[in-house]
């Protein structure tokens, strides 16, 4: 397995120590049957107590070395396996951080969680076993077979005939178990997906009375996982008894043949005892080998799933000669067309406009017109399919991604909160911010009032995904987070939708001095939110069908007129024109 070998090479010293401890333990264990054989032949049968006492001392010394070897072996194995699992999880997480939205959609959140946790854990279990047995098993088996051949060639035929039967059985079991293991891991993905959907969408499920449907969906997937696991466990549970049955038959045959050999003085009683001990070591080595071989399919499936993530190259990457972006003075869309990965039709078509520092730009249009998609392209969450987006006259693909995003403050349509304090959420983009800066940002975002009513104020805890605060409070905290960052380009993607009209108006007024030296980009549904914009872009089916000020669009754009008249009275529109 390339994945395991790649990470194993990082711990060469520990692996070498593991190697040494394996050899030490194996040689000690394999020496004991020979000593017992000599004790029987030269001590017990001759009643030489002095010889027996001397061999007892040697056995005690060897046993201490053997125990020390086992302890050292266990420590090395746990050290290597846990560290490698940690490294795999870190690498998967770090690699996923560079994924664009397209790669994240390809794998899915639930599958990524399963790969990072469950699949990495399966590899740890496999590593822990293989590091103990991969070196120990061949040494024990090879040396035991050599000693068996040395003791009696006739008896060794029993062992040599048994081993191929066991190995053949293991190969068959491994082939049968691999597809079952793969189905298991995929089923865990689906179970996690259903769980996640039910936890995050519990209100929708209840409002549509779909609890029974969701229970059945989860139960069906859970039953499938149970069935696959049961088949796997049954397969494994049959393998071990079969092995011991075969081992017992071999032992009985050895004892039967030994009677004839003892009568002809071909072997001694000590030889027979040692032979049976070595036979046990051979069989146990084969058993351990079987266990590793049976664990391999599941670990291999997990390794493939992890490699699938690590081998996926992010589609959004830095240019080889990327440049730093210090501030944004101008922003231009030049004949931009965009289609989502695997999408049949373009979501945006021939988008063309320019704006500069100090301007407020608004985007409005019907649902599905491409408003949110347009602003996502500015952050390079996706790259354009055709055309270019330029900042300060340079294609944004030429800029270093980190420096580009450091100049953009983006408030998503759905506000996201992290588990932690209100302070940590506001300061997420600027952890070093002073208390005064944080309070100012919260005040501008109209969040300070509700924060002051909380028991611990800014230190009050927010639950995972902000489940203990309202939608409007989430939006205000998200807005405060961006205000504190002080970017060159503010992007508010329908971020005022959960606010009442009064709070919306106060917030927009408070925002003006904050954004006067930046480009202020707003996606909105409300005409009242964007009436004072320097330029309003009207989108319909991914195309610009109108562009200008509020007054200009009321005269020239029929779609804008429809939206305006559906939200405002003629008197309100006339009053705005007069002012």
Identify what each model region corresponds to.
Residues 1-29, 36, 44-58, 65, ...:
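Membrane-integrated ABC transporters
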Residues 9-12, 98-102, 118-127, 131, ...:
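An intracellular "coupling" helix at the cytosolic face of ABC transporter transmembrane type-1 domains
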Residues 10, 14-27, 38, 59-68, ...:
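Transmembrane helices of ABC transporter permease
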Residues 25, 29, 33, 61, ...:
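Alpha-helical transmembrane segments
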Residues 46, 82, 90-114, 118-120, ...:
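Short intracellular "coupling" helices and adjacent cytoplasmic loop segments at the cytosolic face
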Residues 47-48, 143, 147-164, 170, ...:
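Helix-loop-helix
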Residues 325-579:
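ABC-type nucleotide-binding domain
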């Amino acid at each position: 397995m390339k994945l395991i070998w790649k990470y194993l090479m990082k711990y060469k010293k520990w692996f070498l120590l593991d190697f040494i401890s394996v050899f030490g333990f194996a040689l000690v264990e394999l020496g004991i049957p020979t000593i017992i054989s000599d004790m029987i032949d030269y001590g017990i049968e001759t009643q030489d107590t002095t010889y027996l006492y001397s061999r007892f001392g040697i056995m005690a010394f060897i046993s201490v070395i053997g125990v020390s070897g086992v302890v050292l072996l266990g420590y090395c194995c746990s050290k290597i396996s846990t560290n490698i699992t940690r490294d795999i999880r870190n690498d998967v997480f770090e690699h996923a951080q560079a994924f664009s939205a397209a790669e994240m959609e390809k794998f899915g959140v639930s599958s990524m969680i399963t790969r990072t946790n469950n699949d990495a854990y399966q590899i740890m279990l496999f590593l822990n076993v293989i590091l103990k047995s991969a070196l120990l098993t061949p040494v024990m088996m090879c040396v035991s077979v050599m000693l068996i051949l040395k003791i009696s060639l006739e008896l060794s035929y029993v062992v040599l005939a048994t081993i191929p039967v066991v190995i053949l059985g293991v190969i068959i079991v491994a082939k049968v178990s691999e597809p079952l293991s793969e189905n298991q891991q995929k089923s865990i993905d689906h179970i996690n997906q259903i769980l996640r959907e039910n936890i995050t969408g519990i209100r929708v499920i209840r409002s549509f009375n779909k609890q029974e449907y969701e229970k059945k969906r989860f139960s069906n997937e859970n039953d499938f996982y149970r069935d696959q696991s049961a088949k796997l466990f049954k397969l494994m549970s049959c393998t071990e008894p079969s092995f011991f049955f075969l081992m017992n038959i071999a032992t009985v045959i050895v004892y039967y043949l030994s009677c004839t050999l003892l009568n002809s003085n071909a072997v001694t009683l000590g030889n027979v005892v040692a032979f049976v001990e070595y036979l046990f070591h051979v069989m146990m080595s084969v058993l351990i080998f079987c266990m590793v071989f049976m664990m391999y399919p599941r670990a291999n499936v997990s390794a493939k799933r992890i490699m699938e993530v690590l081998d996926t190259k992010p589609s959004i990457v830095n240019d080889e000669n990327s440049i730093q972006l210090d501030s944004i003075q101008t922003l231009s869309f030049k004949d931009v067309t965009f289609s989502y990965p695997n999408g049949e039709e373009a979501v945006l078509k021939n988008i063309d406009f320019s704006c500069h520092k100090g301007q407020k730009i608004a985007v409005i249009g019907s649902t599905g017109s491409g408003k949110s998609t347009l602003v996502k392209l500015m952050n390079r969450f996706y790259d354009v399919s055709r055309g270019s987006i330029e900042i300060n006259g340079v294609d944004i693909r030429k800029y270093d991604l980190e420096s580009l995003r450091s100049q953009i403050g983006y408030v998503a349509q759905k506000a996201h909160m992290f588990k932690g304090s209100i302070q940590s959420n506001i300061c997420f983009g600027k952890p070093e911010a002073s208390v005064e800066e944080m309070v100012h940002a919260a005040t501008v975002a109209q969040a300070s009032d509700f924060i002051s009513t909380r028991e611990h104020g800014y230190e009050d805890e927010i639950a995972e995904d902000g489940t203990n605060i309202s939608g409007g409070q989430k939006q205000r905290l998200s807005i405060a987070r961006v205000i504190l960052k002080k970017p060159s380009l503010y992007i508010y993607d329908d971020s005022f939708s959960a606010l009442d009209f009064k709070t919306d108006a106060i917030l927009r007024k408070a925002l003006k001095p904050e954004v006067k030296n930046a480009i202020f980009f707003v996606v909105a549904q409300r005409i009242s939110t964007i009436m004072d914009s320097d330029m309003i872009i009207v989108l319909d089916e991914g195309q610009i069908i109108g562009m200008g000020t509020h007054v200009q669009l009321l005269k020239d754009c029929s779609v804008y007129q429809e939206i305006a008249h559906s939200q405002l009275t003629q008197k309100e529109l006339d009053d705005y024109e007069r002012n």
